[in-house]
Amino acid sequence: MAEGGVVDLETQRSEVSALLKTPLRRGDTWYLIDSRWFKQWKKYVGFDSWDKYQMGDQNVYPGPIDNSGLLKDTDTQSLKEHLIDELDYILLPTEGWNKLVSWYSVVESQQPIARKVVEQGMFVKHCKVEVYLTELKLCENGNMNNVVTRRFSKADTIDMIEKEMRTIFSIPDEKETRLWNKYMSNTFEPLNKPESTIQDAGLYQGQMLVIEQKNQEGQWPRGSMPKSSGIPNFSTLPKISPSSLSNNYNNFNSRIMKNSNYCLPSYAAYKNYEYSEPGRHNEQPGLCGLSNLGNTCFMNSAIQCLSNTPPLTEYFLNDKYQDELNMDNPLGMRGEIAKSYAELIKQMWSGKYSYVTPRAFKTQVGRFAPQFSGYQQQDCQELLAFLLDGLHEDLNRIRKKPYIQLKDADGRPDKVVAEEAWENHIKRNDSIIVDIFHGLFKSTLVCPECSKISVTFDPFCYLTLPLPMKKERALEVYLVRMDPLAKPMQYKVIVPKIGNIMDLCTALSSLSGIAPEKMVVTDIYNHRFHRIFAMDENLSSIMERDDIYVFETSINRTEDTEQVIIPVYLREKFRHTSYSHHHGSTLFGQPFLITVPRNITEDKLYNLLLLRMCRYVKATNDTEENDGSLHCNKEHTVNGNGPNGIHEEGSPSEMETDEPDDESSQDQELPSENENSQSEDSVGGDNDSENGLCTEDTCKGQSVTGQKKRLFTFQFSNLGSSDITYIKDDTKYIRFDERQLRLDERSYLALDWDPKLKKKFFDENAAEDFEKHESVDFTPQKKAFMKLKDCIELFTTKEKLGAEDPWYCPNCKEHQQATKKLDLWSLPPVLVVHLKRFSYSRYMRDKLDTLVDFPISDLDMSTFLINPNAGPCCYNLIAVSNHYGGMGGGHYTAFAKNKDDGKWYYFDDSSVSTASEEQIVSKAAYVLFYQRQDTITGTGFFPLDKEVKQGASAATGAPHESDEESNEDENDIENENCMHTN
């Protein structure tokens, strides 16, 4: 283990730094390391420039690698959900991991968290470390109740899984076996491609695999395949789609000859195996569920919403897409996404199935968008954006996109600029997606320096509407009072989301009665102060999992007083070897802050420290009180004259022990990393028993008990000559020289305990005990609801660009924080509204669960359109994607209105049930689909050819020919029927 000198630490730093830059290669193994441990290691080796001053400091020594913070279950070594790279963990290649283990070892009983690098993508390949393995449930055909769970990499093959199952269930090598993929209640699929990977096979989280072996008669218990038929004669097998049988029957006989272990037809990447529930054939078209392939509810929700968008579904059901497939578009997917989507829609609307398994479609999406290739939870809206863009490019009627020179408005009328922008758009983008989903908005930017105004008109496929952000957040903190007898108390405080530490102190003050300026806020981790916050630091740096301790102090930390605040760590000494006299130390317990006079004797400092710990340090004298606790008179400790409220008068004899010295406790002064270092002064060393003196003023009448040994010694760490002067004469006087001693996690006083004395006198259970304030059980009241119009108004509100996303002003020739305003110019036949419920920052992830009240019918958008000739703009709701749960997880479902019967249904993966309009508006609503009323007919399908021809005029506000005849008569009627949202 390397605790060694600066050279060794420099070597560690340089070697690990280089290995962190190792490129990912398919099949390589990388290791997860808890980011908190890694940050501590970086401090110890001086990895970053701001860590140099702590380099080699034994008090920031990280100890053995500890990944317990990443584990949900230490027994199974399963990871917590939704861990984020670099925020929660660091990835290191094998060589880097081995080096760290050789230097620091691993916490006992912990296994390394090793993960493989997998390759994703079809055209643009990229590698990623597969942090979350696929958990599969394994069982035998003869006993499906005996389920064994194992985790596999997506790169593992079916053959590897079979071998693992043979081992688990003790199946002899001579026994023939075959594997089945079992899902839903009674649906099986043969896994007869041993070389296929888990990713190729589309196996998902929680999938159950069944291993079957031949019986004593040499027969398969699940049945055999008749040679005269291409249809499996298994009563327990689901019905397989005819397309899959015809595609695979020709390979049947040759497959049997090649491998007798697998007697069912082979299949092409599991593509065409779509099953219906046995015994159900006559379903209503469109009321077809989608099997969850393992965290794919986000995809199922998106598909159900698109499936119930009438003009798009009619387009695919009528095979119009076949004439418009663009196989050569470099921005498209060679038509594969469109064809796969069409096949899925036809199955869903065939009326043959109560549910289908969208594995083929999922595979195609993963090939072209690697971010969706796994089986982790994803964002439904992000998938919708990809699908709409992918379908558009696959079906783009423009075969060769012309170059378009974009022009600024330059003061021209909006109508002219809008018409020009739309015409330019459809010269390059002309598809069914443009016809149905694309609209136009106006963007106005104003330079704050030169007042340059830039106006552009841009197309959109959906509207992302902001929700008013939560202005507050709840934080749980622990308050440590000056009274040493008071246990720490846990509080829940409500603080501004965009606030600072002073806001936290003010909120805590209202509950505790302690003045904010008498508080110091800290983050404690691994027995040390991870951070000591300044009052002006942002609260966003405090994460939910941080242990925040707020210490009451008797002084304002920023004032020049005759007292100083010192961080105190507790250390337990140990000897490296039985024959070595060199000692090390390890941290334990909770650190604390103590206020002491700038000028203080060593004895008095010792007494103050011991009195500060009197709640959990037992009596050190046989004549102490019977309860065994150190005598603390509350009247003295609270109302006394000393710092922290502790009376300055006190006999050192009460704070010492008659324990005899032994070999393990003779060395009371721990050597610093560098014996000549000026940053660490040792106090209370070997000669303390001879010099336990205090000042003349405070020691009158006190006996000097030099024969008694102290419970601990102490050392000042990272306090240089400009901070502290330690006069090692007869008085042993300590003088803090700086007017404002710096208070941070780097400079502290370490109390070194002998193991035997610690075991006898230090009560760790009492030290960790705390109380709960009633605020902990308080649930903040949330706003009842807001209206959809509030979100639209927020979308069109003028805003100032942030410093991280400035606008380049062509006039100033510089990036400026311009003001920006968006306005709606024209709206599409189907308006997709994305409610921006998720917010992200460097330190925080959050979901807004505000109830947004949106109309089911008659959504009038005329209020928000600045185009006077926009035409009809009343909409009816046709679908909603719902998200339940929090960030990074949860569950997606959908409400949708069937185009044939006009009724609402609830789609929850493979389940479909009737729904009422009262159920639709909820806090879970995430993406809304509205269809314009003038495009709705009896079948839900409108003449798309008309929309194609008149798309440009509709987008720019020019009325259709048919509209001109009826606008005067119908507009008034239509507006009367609309429920205005203002």
Curated annotation (Swiss-Prot):
Keywords: Cytoplasm, Hydrolase, Nucleus, Protease, Thiol protease, Ubl conjugation pathway. One of its GO terms (molecular function) is cysteine-type endopeptidase activity. GO terms for biological process: BMP signaling pathway; monoubiquitinated protein deubiquitination; negative regulation of transforming growth factor beta receptor signaling pathway; proteolysis; transcription elongation-coupled chromatin remodeling. The active site is at 297 (nucleophile), 891 (proton acceptor). It catalyses: Thiol-dependent hydrolysis of ester, thioester, amide, peptide and isopeptide bonds formed by the C-terminal Gly of ubiquitin (a 76-residue protein attached to proteins as an intracellular targeting signal). Its EC number is 3.4.19.12. Disulfide bonds: none annotated. GO terms for cellular component: cytoplasm; nucleus. Residues 623-695, 950-982 are annotated as: Disordered. It is an enzyme of class 3 (hydrolase). Its main location: cytoplasm. InterPro entries: DUSP-like_sf, Papain-like_cys_pep_sf, Pept_C19_DUSP, Peptidase_C19_UCH, Ub_carboxyl-term_hydrolase, Ub_USP-typ, Ubiquitin-like_domsf, USP_C. Residues 288-933 form the USP domain. It is found in: Cytoplasm; Nucleus. Residues 7-118 form the DUSP domain. The keyword Cytoplasm applies. It holds the Pfam family UCH. Belongs to the peptidase C19 family. Hydrolase that removes conjugated ubiquitin from target proteins and regulates various pathways such as the TGF-beta receptor signaling and NF-kappa-B pathways. Acts as a key regulator of TGF-beta receptor signaling pathway, but the precise mechanism is still unclear: according to a report, acts by promoting deubiquitination of monoubiquitinated R-SMADs, thereby alleviating inhibition of R-SMADs and promoting activation of TGF-beta target genes. This is Ubiquitin carboxyl-terminal hydrolase 15. It comes from Xenopus tropicalis. The gene is usp15.
